[in-house]
Amino acid sequence: MPRKGPVAQRPLVKDPVYGDVLVSQLVNKILIDGKKSTAERIVYGALEQCREKTGTDPVLTLKKALDNVKPALEVRSRRVGGATYQVPVDVRPGRSTTLALRWLVTFSRQRRENSMIERLANEILDASNGLGASVKRREDIHKMAEANRAFAHYRW
């Protein structure tokens, strides 16, 4: 923890091609070993495939997918008198976006298509239609929060 008070959050940079912050965040999530040009090629290719398959703006498709994947609740472990409880808490907006992007990338890497461009494009399209592994992950998290609703009074 810094002694000089809270650290200022860096401003989010808009993407040069689509002019959207979410696209640049997605590029940074795809990034491996600092190869940003490769990550950009993958994301732009996937968004272009989304445009070809749906005929709509790919950024709108991405936003719709993220809205379907963003969690509203999550569980956090809280130790109370020797027992650990899974306490449901609300997710901050920034964290929900980060989690949604992380899940999109993680589950697109696990898909069986040939190239990463195809995998990411299909995961985005599935998520925008309410399907796919990333949407299932959100549903599982919400189910867990609902199951542990009795411990909500331990919220901090």
From Swiss-Prot:
The subunit field of the Swiss-Prot or TrEMBL record says:
Part of the 30S ribosomal subunit. Contacts proteins S9 and S11.
- Provide GO CC annotations from the record: small ribosomal subunit
Instruction: Return one Gene Ontology term, BP aspect.
Output: translation
Give the protein's biological function: One of the primary rRNA binding proteins, it binds directly to 16S rRNA where it nucleates assembly of the head domain of the 30S subunit. Is located at the subunit interface close to the decoding center, probably blocks exit of the E-site tRNA.
Q: Which NCBIfam families match?
A: rpsG_bact
Q: Which family does it belong to?
A: Belongs to the universal ribosomal protein uS7 family.
- Transmembrane segments annotated in the record for this chain: none
Q: Which GO terms describe its molecular function?
A: rRNA binding; structural constituent of ribosome; tRNA binding
Per the UniProt entry, the signal peptide is none
Q: Which PROSITE patterns match?
A: RIBOSOMAL_S7 (PS00052)
Which named protein is this?
A: Small ribosomal subunit protein uS7
UniProt KW keywords: Ribonucleoprotein, Ribosomal protein, RNA-binding, rRNA-binding, tRNA-binding
The family database entries (Pfam families) matched by this protein are listed as: Ribosomal_S7
